[in-house]
UniProtKB/Swiss-Prot annotation:
Main localization (coarse): cytoplasm
Organism listed in the record: Cenarchaeum symbiosum (strain A)
One GO CC annotation: cytoplasm
Location within or outside the cell: Cytoplasm
PANTHER family: PREFOLDIN SUBUNIT 5
Protein's name according to its UniProt entry: Prefoldin subunit alpha
Function comment: Molecular chaperone capable of stabilizing a range of proteins. Seems to fulfill an ATP-independent, HSP70-like function in archaeal de novo protein folding.
Length: 143
């Protein structure tokens, strides 16, 4: 293996390492979103179970106000691009559960890509080690 080939392979392995790290970060972010979505579903299900529920409304910078929510109130859902819609409890739950399914698909896809890239990375490292080992044996025999 020439030095140029080794450099090229090393660069490709570094790119794969970066990609694996990016996929790991995306996985972590998606897991966080999944937890948040599950908490939202749980909270929406709990609204109105006992008539009127007391909740904390976030005002920003860690500041909250106590408020009461009754079972008949609409739920406001952010649908992206700064837009929000009001939905009844069942429609809100349906929307949240469909979003969870989308996130699960994205998580599986990201995980599969990370695993494939990690396997390619390990294979590439083993191949590079093997090539470097053969190179050192051939050069040490010429001394």
């Amino acid at each position: 293996m020439s030095e140029e080939e080794a450099q090229k392979m090393l660069y490709q392995l570094q790119m794969l390492e970066t990609y694996v790290a990016d996929m790991s970060q995306r996985e972590s972010a998606l897991v966080g979103v999944m937890k948040e979505a599950a908490a939202a579903v749980s909270a929406v299900k709990g609204i109105g179970e006992k008539g009127e529920s007391e909740v904390l409304v976030p005002l920003g910078l860690g500041t909250f106000a106590k408020s009461k929510v009754s079972s008949g109130e609409k739920i406001v859902i952010n649908i992206g691009a700064g837009a929000a819609v009001e939905k009844d409890k069942d429609a809100a739950l349906s929307y949240l559960e469909s979003r969870i399914k989308e996130i699960e698909i994205a998580l599986r896809d990201t995980s599969a890509k990370r695993q494939e890239a990690a396997a390619n990375l390990e294979h590439g490292k083993a191949h590079l080690d093997q090539m470097m080992g053969q190179h050192s044996h051939s050069t040490s025999g010429n001394v």
